[in-house]
Amino acid sequence: MSDLFRMEERRQMPILPTEPARKEGDGGGPQKPDVKRPDTSDLLRRMKRVDPDAARRYRQRSGE
């Protein structure tokens, strides 16, 4: 009866590293541009120039 419940051992797979094997500073690929987030007041001012109604709707939606 104990032979019915005998299970095979699971095969252990090798654990892969969590980070890819890259050299730091190789400089071969594209890099993220260094830009800061725009100021919201500047954004509203530019939106008013382009479309005043869109600026009003954005102001209501964002709570400003």
Swiss-Prot record:
Top-level taxonomic group: Bacteria
Listed transmembrane segments: none
Keyword Acyltransferase: no
Gene Ontology molecular function: protein tag activity
Per UniProt, location of the Isoglutamyl lysine isopeptide (Glu-Lys) (interchain with K-? in acceptor proteins) cross-link in this chain: E64
Annotated region (Disordered), positions in chain: 1-64
InterPro entries (UniProt xref): UBact
Comp. bias regions, Basic and acidic residues: 1-12, 33-64
Pfam family, one: UBact
Keywords carried by this UniProt record: Isopeptide bond, Ubl conjugation pathway
Family: Belongs to the ubiquitin-like protein UBact family.
Its job: May function as a protein modifier covalently attached to lysine residues of substrate proteins. This may serve to target the modified proteins for degradation by proteasomes.
The protein's name in its UniProt record: Prokaryotic ubiquitin-like protein UBact
UniProt organism field: Chthonomonas calidirosea (strain DSM 23976 / ICMP 18418 / T49)
Gene: ubact
